């Protein structure tokens, strides 16, 4: 949180995959302190939160709705829902398709636009309104792991370019 207060940041991206601290701790494999969501002195207009859809955690409209409200309550202006890329057994077993979320069934969620590059990637944008507060929602519907070669990913052992297995940076 101290790093988030630095005035030179233009944008801060935060992985926030659940609204419940105990479930978030399960996902991360470590204890998340209760004060993890204390953002006093942080310019939250710079913050984007990203939520991976994971079976057993955020995997339906009700859970997604709670995640939207959680972000609004924290004062975070943007949240992204991201489907896991089926790049390993865990991701294949815990994959949740964004279509199964039925985001449009959540009251006061409005579709704004969608962009795609054919079978390589598709993203959609929405707005959510509650009590005169607006939350921007972005969704990565799907992405071809081989298409995303411009992304650098650390898999816990190697730095990779893109999300596929062959491209290790030494």
Give, region by region, the residue ranges found by the protein language model.
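Conserved SAM/AdoMet-binding glycine-rich loop
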Residues: 1-24
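Radical SAM enzyme [4Fe-4S]-AdoMet core and its adjacent flexible, acidic
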Residues: 22-147, 155
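Alpha-helix boundary/interfacial micro-motifs
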Residues: 7-10, 32-34, 166
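Flexible mid-to-C-terminal extensions adjoining Fe-S/redox cofactors in radical SAM and related proteins
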Residues: 141-170
